[in-house]
Amino acid sequence: MAFTGKYEFESEKNYDEFMKRLGLPDEVIERGRNFKIITEVQQDGENFTWSQSYSGGNIMSNKFTIGKECEMQTMGGKKFKATVKMEGGKVVADFPNYHQTSEVVGDKLVEISTIGDVTYERVSKRVA
């Protein structure tokens, strides 16, 4: 299914446990809990631009082509190299400390991040 669209944060599961597992300080976890994230995805075949805007004006944007190594950036600004894949209609990426899958289900963008035995799920609703 096509990913292109603008999505607004709707719900999440296991936020605190996942962020603690990543090693984030309590004050950063608390501040992040109040973010209203807007995700914008532009897909042109195998080419993607994936941007997330956070409360306070911070924006993280990654450009990648399915199956090709690229340089990406974490929310904290750390740059790393990864090869993003498409598996069963899901965009799959390995970040430095966790594994993430993203898929469109109806009008929702479902992002699942896993570190060890902790899984974080963020659901966003398509608004455009």
Swiss-Prot record:
Compartments it resides in: Cytoplasm; Membrane
GO cellular component: cytosol; membrane; nucleus
Keywords: Acetylation, Cytoplasm, Lipid transport, Lipid-binding, Membrane, Transport
Domain of life: Eukaryota
A single BP term in Gene Ontology: steroid metabolic process
Transmembrane segments: none
Keyword Metal-binding in record: no
Protein's recorded name: Gastrotropin
The organism of origin for this protein: Rattus norvegicus (Rat)
Name of the coding gene: Fabp6
